[in-house]
Amino acid sequence: MATFSEDMLIRMELTALTEPGNPVTGQLVRAIGLTETLALIRDPGSAIPAAVDPLQGVRWRQAAAARQADALRDQIAELTDRHEFRALTPGGAGWPVALNDLGDRAPLMLWAHGNPELLTASASSRVTITGARAATAYGVHVTQELAEDLAALPRIIVSGGAYGIDAAAHRAALTTGPAATMVVSASGLDRPYPPNNAELFERIVVQAGIQISETPPGQGPSRERFVARSRLLAALSGATIIPEASARSGSLLVAARAFELGRAVGAVPGPVTSASSAGCHRLMREGIAETVTRAGEVAELMDPSPFPLAPAYQQVARRAAPDHSRAARRLAL
């Protein structure tokens, strides 16, 4: 069995006890370190540090303490070793530095299966494509065209592995060759979700792609983990593209997170009569996303400097930034 450092074992335990993306975890680790953060959970009588809001700190500890179990870290370590997953930590080898932009909401660690070079590439070499699970034929078609052409540039296609737009993006990227796509999972890597896409995930790894997750092995997805994953999808890439999304699609949250991080956001327009494109139209209407219809426009969106009209667009964006920020907050609710 592989030997994991005490630091790594504590991170494994904390990821199992706390929900991903909770800023209280990040604030505590930054203020008092990993060991003392775990001690706060184990000792309900210990004082909450001044680095966090007292009420939030108490709620955080209560939720984490309720998840404690015997040999929890050992179980996670054993599954990590059994499946030969890579365990990555901030600042360590293979860590995607783009995630550091998340600050206190950055993951404590990641599990990875596949080609690690896709993680060490710059954010500008990756494009997140996500959208409707119940995709229409139109949505699948434009997704396939975008993903194939972007992968050929080349750009690494990042998505969440869901049905519909996500799966279409992964499959299209695979047609261009190896090392073309990355799956960001909301469940442990040994618990593929959705299960019917397990074969797709295996194919991605075989073709030098990669799967990653901040959820420990042995644990399934949850609503909170799907929501938290949105920030990873947004932060990993230089741009987020929504080919098709309804007004209530979870992919709008990815777009909002990307906008908040200062990443480029694009959306593909659809038929005005189609409810399946209402979310894309909202993103464009509220100034969160630029209109994109082809890979070249996505590349321009990520690096506008070579194009003569870019400065004018940037001035307009700066003038409209306050309204855009409010729109992003509404999408995140």
Language model features with spans:
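Short, small/acidic-rich helices and loops at N termini and domain boundaries
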Residues: 1-94
